[in-house]
Amino acid sequence: MSRRGTAEEKTAKPDPIYWNRLVNMLVNRILKHGKKSLAYQIIYRALKKIQQKTEKNPLYVLRQAIRGVTPDIAVKARRVGGSTHQVPIEIGSTQGKALAVRWLLVASKKRPGQNMAFKLSSELVDAAKGSGDAIRKKEETHKMAEASRAFAHLR
């Protein structure tokens, strides 16, 4: 038996302006080479653009987008007797949000456009409406999980 204590679970700190954990998750995922102030600039500009486009609270649009992209189920490769099967597994809320943030950023990087703030704002607005590349990725993941339901007993 281990003599070490259990590590306490760390919670993400909220960002300084909106005081929101989701914004901070986005900032930490968009961060490159330790330039956090640049990451904050990009996110805040994107939220400002969302405010101008939709005339709604940008945090509400962000929450809607992440809720729309968050997957309930995913597939995990599992090796059984020499062959690899895609086994569907349920995803917890934290992991689902992390996947949603990652998919939103990947989809916004793929978009054509001037700068990252513009592309991110467009992707977030589209995801909140129920369209866009990130939503397509979620639906694709759900389809794969549905197709491999026969292997659900291999969990």
From Swiss-Prot:
One of its GO terms (cellular component) is small ribosomal subunit. Its main location: plastid. The keyword rRNA-binding applies. Disulfide bonds: none annotated. It holds the Pfam family Ribosomal_S7. It is found in: Plastid. GO terms for molecular function: rRNA binding; structural constituent of ribosome. GO terms for biological process: translation. PROSITE patterns: RIBOSOMAL_S7 (PS00052). Keywords: Plastid, Ribonucleoprotein, Ribosomal protein, RNA-binding, rRNA-binding. NCBIfam families: rpsG_bact. One of the primary rRNA binding proteins, it binds directly to 16S rRNA where it nucleates assembly of the head domain of the 30S subunit. Belongs to the universal ribosomal protein uS7 family. Part of the 30S ribosomal subunit. This is Small ribosomal subunit protein uS7cz/uS7cy. It comes from Epifagus virginiana (Beechdrops).
